[in-house]
Amino acid sequence: MVDGTVDGRSYRCLLDTGTGRTHIVADDFISEFAPLRQIASSGVFAPSNDVLIQLPDVTVGALSRRPCEVVRLDVGQPGARNLLGMDLMKTHRCDFLFDDGRLVIDSPGQLETSHDLHLDDADHPYVGVRFPELTAQAVWDTGAGITIVDRGFLATHPDSFHEFGSSTGTDATGAQVETPTFVVSEMTIGGVRFSPHRVAAVDLAPANATLARPMDLILGFTTLVQANWHFDFSRQAVGVTRGFDR
């Protein structure tokens, strides 16, 4: 979670690289702003229609946007919470230091070792995930609690996954679905090998149908916490250094 301001008023947000646009839950102040338009969006489990409003500014530390179009969420919407999206991060270097619980913005110097990073039209960051037989495409999503693997991908590469119970997941629309879970046995990102950990299997075909670049995985906290991540979003480069296992 990060603390920020909207027109000088304090708001706490979940930092969410999996959403292209910042979301703010309506309160008395936010409700004063007239809707600009509605846009269609999609979570992992369900589609939704979002209301856009324009705020004077949104600021979180060195991240700031003036003015800033955000999605306004109804306070009664299931799972509604403030989300700091890629609209504030996409022009910055962001170092996600999970072993120290810190986010560093615009640190000086170049990445010592970098790999290609792709941002799609909605500014979702994609990284390559190396399995023994191929490289998969994954969205790097700090808003996801558990890593998600597409069921179709899992079915064609079963040797890398071992069944392990089930879990109830919630997507950005608030929809909840119970999903089977697996342990991923071996994968490498940015030259760093990740220890076996739990992932959830979800049919990503509906979400992928709306994307120019389909995703095989959505990397969530269970994966991200094992490393430190150094993103230069403006140069579309990422470096990965070994953190600690959890």
Model regions and ranges:
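Pepsin/retropepsin-fold aspartyl endopeptidases
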Residues: 1-246
